[in-house]
Amino acid sequence: MGARGSVLSGKKTDELEKVRLRPGGKKKYMLKHVVWAVNELDRFGLAESLLESKEGCQKILKVLAPLVPTGSENLKSLFNIVCVIFCLHAEEKVKDTEEAKKIAQRHLAADTEKMPATNKPTAPPSGGNYPVQQLAGNYVHLPLSPRTLNAWVKLVEEKKFGAEVVPGFQALSEGCTPYDINQMLNCVGEHQAAMQIIREIINEEAADWDQQHPSPGPMPAGQLRDPRGSDIAGTTSTVEEQIQWMYRAQNPVPVGNIYRRWIQLGLQKCVRMYNPTNILDIKQGPKEPFQSYVDRFYKSLRAEQTDPAVKNWMTQTLLIQNANPDCKLVLKGLGMNPTLEEMLTACQGIGGPGQKARLMAEALKEALTPAPIPFAAVQQKAGKRGTVTCWNCGKQGHTARQCRAPRRQGCWKCGKTGHIMSKCPERQAGFLGLGPWGKKPRNFPMTQVPQGVTPSAPPMNPAEGMTPRGATPSAPPADPAVEMLKSYMQMGRQQRESRERPYKEVTEDLLHLNSLFGEDQ
């Protein structure tokens, strides 16, 4: 083991090997555990010689104890081994690691209570960061630290007189005198236009102060005068006078807070100048997340110098009104006056890829879903199906294929044999005749006028065609359209027969065996 195993004597090593790792467990500590603990101490920058004494182990435990709740498994194992070694040096009889930890923690708590009051950390005195501090009953001015001035300059350079500059100035100038505030303003190198605006506001407020607080006249020698507007601005007063005005017993005048208020008015005017965006123009883009839109809205609202009631109305009305259509639809479903947390939660996924995919899926589902048929259309369609007429028996309610009557031979239209209904020569055709290759006519069909039908009533004019009673009426004159229709039908029939004749002749020749074998058959 070498020197690393020499932190414990032989007797203490024997006692170490009797301590169990866990309560009720079989495994016990061995010398290799001490060697591992020495290696871990090197990682923490602690000397291995600390394990040789009780005080050294106590110092190690003080370092490791604050790290145990959030430490790794190796750190907790090292803490357990040091607790066991501490108990061995303190001649405490322990059976397992848990007992050693309890004893070590009890000793650490007792040492903490015995610590003298001078060694305990004390909080800094209140008001230690303020430029004016009270020492030995007297108020003493301390200049601003370079860190405070640097923070103010960085705030102005980074935000460029944004809405954050006003609360930042309030925090950094807390408890300052007019002298300190002028020092902060003089540190701003750029943005001299804004500085000139602040100077004009200071001059206006100083003039108003002089009008509201006129001078009472000459004061007795040695008596402190009342501050004028220029005194509050720090141009005609010293630091000592400013401190006396702020902390005197009778009628104190907080010149520092008054001057800070004037500077805030100037900064607010600069914020409006450097941020000309009106809150009415803050609208959410079609693809902008709702959270980003809310951040821009409240940033612009922060720059608005209006009454809190007006800001509350803007928040409840304009925030929902200027949202995009998708978010507006969701926000209107939240009811009246929803909280900002509810609005952010409801609009969390709007505008993202998940919401777009959901909309596309809904649109695709609607496109693939068949449109429902109205009930009236279903009844009308069912009624039409019931008017089917059978060509075989002439009855309604079924088709010819479903007819149980004997199959009628020949054409179902004219009753003749030798052809079917689709090739019936008595089909109706228009005056243009049948189409090419036996297709349907290219015009609307015309009904044939049956011959021999005479009108049942005499003509209206008796002088033109009235026959005497008892005489046989003459046949009506032939209609030229009917004659033309008949001629076209005859020509169509002839053309169809001429087209079908070659096929019939070839078929008959093929079926006739004499044409193939001659007289052998």
Curated annotation (Swiss-Prot):
The modification Phosphoserine is found at S145. Keywords: AIDS, Capsid protein, Host cell membrane, Host cytoplasm, Host endosome, Host membrane, Host nucleus, Host-virus interaction, Lipoprotein, Membrane, Metal-binding, Myristate, Phosphoprotein, Repeat, RNA-binding, Viral budding, Viral budding via the host ESCRT complexes, Viral nucleoprotein, Viral release from host cell, Virion, Zinc, Zinc-finger. A motif (PTAP/PSAP motif) lies at residues 455-458. Residues 274-360 are annotated as: Dimerization/Multimerization of capsid protein p24. Residues 186-223 are annotated as: Interaction with host PPIA/CYPA and NUP153. It holds the Pfam family Gag_p24. Residues 73-77 are annotated as: Interaction with membrane phosphatidylinositol 4,5-bisphosphate. A zinc finger (CCHC-type) spans 388-405, 409-426. A motif (Nuclear localization signal) lies at residues 26-32. GO terms for cellular component: host cell nucleus; host cell plasma membrane; host multivesicular body; membrane; viral nucleocapsid; virion membrane. One of its GO terms (molecular function) is structural molecule activity. Gag-Pol polyprotein: Specific enzymatic cleavages by the viral protease yield mature proteins. SUPFAM superfamilies: Retroviral matrix proteins, Retrovirus capsid dimerization domain-like, Retrovirus capsid protein, N-terminal core domain, Retrovirus zinc finger-like domains. Late-budding domains (L domains) are short sequence motifs essential for viral particle budding. They recruit proteins of the host ESCRT machinery (Endosomal Sorting Complex Required for Transport) or ESCRT-associated proteins. p6-gag contains one L domains: a PTAP/PSAP motif, which interacts with the UEV domain of TSG101. This is Gag polyprotein. The lineage of its organism: Viruses, Riboviria, Pararnavirae, Artverviricota, Revtraviricetes. The gene is gag.
